[in-house]
């Protein structure tokens, strides 16, 4: 959790880093009393590893510029508390208006979440004024397409109407296979959609096969098997051919020989003012939703000048939260239900400029600039090309056809900037049958098998709910890829195109489950909170909070000695000698009885008290924290994790700060969340050299502004 901080002797919370620091407390939509479902892999460790790679890249960039090394402090806890998978935006929600997110029942949101179909399950999201009318026509309910009862937030639609629509939806789904339902939803309703696939489905899918997503590697002990090939593709500095896993001690002599050689001499640059690693790098940002903006947030945090290019003639999807503005009363009603995935407003008040006040957007908009231009028009493209000529990097994560129609592909921009680095982050890549499929992280994770493997072993996919770990990982890996491309350009003068398919980027995280299929032909199935060799390995209920809310602790026992210590702390030492639980093998064979026995005992304890008692005995455990508990975490407070930041519209709010520390590169949030068009004058006049007359023409044609054009934002009468 980071050195020298208030939680001493903490063994890694092996399966619940995402619970103690992140959003596991919200996962799983089963009936009250059922444990949360963890991610389907050791996600916190992998995500922390990706953060470590990015942090190392930042340190290398600094070293190459100054000759000075650095010390990097990464806390797995911090990486989860700051993750885009709901933890960071939900903490911003809480700062804005006190929302405490809650778990909710499966199927409770209209046209969203996992549903059964003819040959399995799909996850389709078709809510909102952009998609819902087309969705209703698609499922045979055209008479409801303009129904005013559906203009309220999805969670406030009358239950009778929801049930009526869901019945038609069910009938439609049961006449279609997974592939058919996803394809028709994508093509007819432009819905966000993905199948919930098994490892077998994934490995056999022609989309990934055609894109070269698998790599056959031979090993002397396991033979040839297919592995995930690469998280992203770099056109000018491709990843070397993967090598097999080494045998134990295979390279000892080679490493010792290299270690005996003198280190290369490095010339330190003259001492000067403190600089962040990416100072002087200009990044043009055409990103939407979460993964892309998160990538550019990380780059901006470490010094890059990130300029968002945003239209005022239309609302970008799921970005500034302005597709449809709710009233203050509607916001408060949704907040009282613990539901605010799309963000909320300070004190629930949308104000005059709700697009600047959305907590979801603002949680990743710090340290950035904003200019406005409609790049789908000739004038807007001309301005965009002029900006690109001054830039180092362009980042986008749109549906590929959107970028192609706007004529801002890498090939079309090269004449304006031959050394440009362009990062493209589509859901499923720039080629293949799924190229133009629309998806959020949760739909991508369904398509690649993560939703399947993280489900409850005895349950159904709708019960495990939605997670957005793909967005978080995509943002981190995208920033890392850009950092590597910048190093390559510094050495060679060569820019390049980086293609980061968010689906393929996640495949290495599922390596264990994928290799179980490719090596053994074994489907691991939904794993819930189970572990192959550890028991107990579960989230257990503890004493409810003072206001009656559920409270949970994750416990991970690897050895019989740890189990004995657990039993003593729980006041039931006799359990350790019970024949059903005396050995790990016995506990794994009697999991239901074990979980029932341990859960009955943990209910008597406060989760924080039990956490500290178990840690003091060497038992890996961690409380599943709510948003308010993370805000008041003495550990995060001691590490200076939260920062109080101002913005003219949303005021002073608390946000998660940077989540690793470099000893010789101190870093804080330097600028509050950027407002729409806030930097138009600077970008157009100073950077691009527009004259007063040129600038006036763009203003008159509706490109330049700080509010959306008349009629673009849909407001209810009383908003």
Question: Can you annotate each of these PLM segments?
Answer:
Residues 1-2, 76-81, 119-121, 127-131, ...:
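Glycine-rich beta-alpha junction loops
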Residues 109, 116-117, 197-282, 525, ...:
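Terminal low-complexity tails and localization/encapsulation signals of metabolic enzymes
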Residues 70, 279-281, 496, 551:
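Nucleotide donor/acceptor-binding cores
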Residues 3-5, 33-42, 64-80, 102-105, ...:
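Conserved Rossmann-fold dehydrogenase catalytic segment
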Residues 1-65, 179, 247, 251-491, ...:
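N-terminal helix-loop segment corresponding to the beta1-alpha1 unit
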Residues 25-27, 31, 49-70, 86-95, ...:
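Oxidoreductase and adenylate-handling cofactor-binding alpha/beta cores
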Residues 36-47, 102-103, 110-112, 121-123, ...:
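A short glycine-threonine-serine/GTX helix/turn-capping micro-motif
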Residues 110-189, 206, 536-617, 621:
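Aromatic-enriched alpha-helical interface/lid elements that frame and gate functional surfaces
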């Amino acid at each position: 959790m980071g050195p020298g901080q208030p939680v001493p002797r903490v063994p890694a919370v092996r399966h619940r880093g995402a619970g103690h620091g992140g959003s596991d407390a919200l996962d799983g939509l089963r009936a009250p009393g059922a444990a949360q479902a963890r991610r389907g892999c050791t996600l916190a460790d992998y995500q922390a590893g990706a953060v470590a790679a990015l942090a190392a890249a930042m340190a290398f960039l600094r070293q190459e510029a100054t000759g000075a090394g650095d010390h990097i402090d990464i806390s797995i806890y911090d990486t989860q508390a700051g993750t885009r998978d709901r933890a960071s935006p939900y903490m911003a929600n809480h700062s804005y208006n006190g929302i405490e997110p809650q778990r909710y029942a499966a199927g409770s949101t209209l046209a969203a979440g996992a549903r059964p179909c003819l040959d399995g399950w799909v996850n389709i999201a078709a809510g909102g004024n952009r998609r819902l009318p087309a969705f209703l026509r698609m499922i045979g309910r055209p008479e409801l397409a303009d129904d005013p009862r559906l203009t309220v937030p999805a969670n406030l639609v009358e239950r009778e109407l929801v049930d009526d629509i869901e019945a038609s939806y069910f009938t439609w789904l049961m006449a279609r296979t997974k592939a058919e339902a996803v394809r028709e939803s994508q093509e007819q309703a432009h819905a966000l959609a993905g199948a919930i696939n098994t490892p077998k489905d994934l490995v056999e899918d022609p989309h990934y096969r055609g894109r070269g997503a698998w790599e056959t590697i031979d090993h002397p002990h396991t033979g040839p098997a297919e592995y995930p090939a690469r998280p992203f593709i770099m056109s000018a500095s491709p990843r070397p051919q993967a090598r097999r896993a080494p045998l134990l001690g295979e390279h000892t002599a080679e490493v010792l020989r290299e270690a005996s050689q003198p280190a290369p001499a490095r010339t330190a640059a003259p001492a000067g003012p403190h600089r962040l690693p990416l100072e002087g790098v200009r990044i043009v940002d055409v990103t939407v939703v979460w993964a892309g903006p998160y990538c550019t947030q990380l780059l901006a945090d470490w010094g890059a000048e990130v300029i968002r290019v945003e239209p005022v003639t239309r609302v970008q999807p799921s970005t500034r939260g302005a597709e449809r503005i709710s009233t203050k009363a509607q916001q408060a009603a949704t907040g009282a239900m613990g539901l605010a995935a799309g963000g909320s407003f300070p004190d629930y008040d949308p104000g005059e400029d709700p697009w600047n006040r959305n907590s979801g957007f603002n949680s990743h908009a710090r340290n950035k600039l904003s200019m406005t231009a409609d790049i789908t028009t000739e004038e807007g493209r001309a301005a965009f090309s002029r900006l690109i000529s001054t830039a180092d990097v362009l980042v986008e994560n749109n549906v590929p056809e959107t970028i192609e129609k706007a004529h801002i592909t890498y090939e079309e921009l090269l004449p304006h900037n031959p050394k440009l680095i362009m990062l493209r982050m589509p859901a499923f890549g720039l080629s293949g049958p799924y190229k133009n499929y629309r998806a959020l992280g949760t739909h991508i994770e369904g398509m690649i098998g993560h939703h399947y493997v993280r489900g409850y072993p005895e349950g159904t996919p709708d019960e495990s709910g939605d997670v957005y770990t793909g967005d978080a990982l995509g943002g981190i890996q995208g920033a890392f890829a850009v950092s590597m491309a910048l190093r390559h350009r510094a050495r060679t003068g060569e820019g390049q195109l980086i293609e980061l398919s968010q689906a393929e980027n996640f495949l290495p995280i599922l390596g264990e489950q994928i290799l179980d299929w490719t090596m053994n032909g074994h489907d691991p199935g939904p794993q819930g909170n189970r572990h192959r060799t550890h028991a107990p390995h579960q989230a257990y209920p503890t004493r409810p909070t003072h206001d009656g809310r559920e409270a949970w602790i994750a416990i991970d026992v690897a050895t019989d000695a740890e189990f004995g210590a657990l039993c003593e702390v729980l006041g039931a030492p006799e359990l350790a000698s019970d024949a059903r639980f005396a050995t790990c093998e016995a506990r794994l064979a009697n999991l239901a009885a074990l979980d029932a026995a341990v859960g009955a005992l943990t209910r008597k304890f406060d989760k924080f008290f039990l956490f500290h008692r178990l840690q003091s005995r060497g038992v890996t455990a961690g409380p599943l924290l709510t948003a308010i508990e993370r805000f008041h975490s003495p550990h995060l407070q001691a590490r200076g994790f939260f920062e109080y930041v101002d913005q003219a519209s949303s005021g002073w709010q608390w946000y998660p700060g940077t989540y690793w520390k470099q000893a010789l590169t101190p870093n804080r949030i330097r600028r509050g969340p950027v407002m729409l068009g806030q930097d138009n004058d600077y970008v157009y006049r100073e950077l691009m050299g527009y004259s007063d007359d040129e600038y006036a023409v763009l203003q008159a044609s509706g490109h330049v502004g700080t509010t959306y054009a008349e009629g673009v934002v849909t407001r209810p009468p009383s908003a």
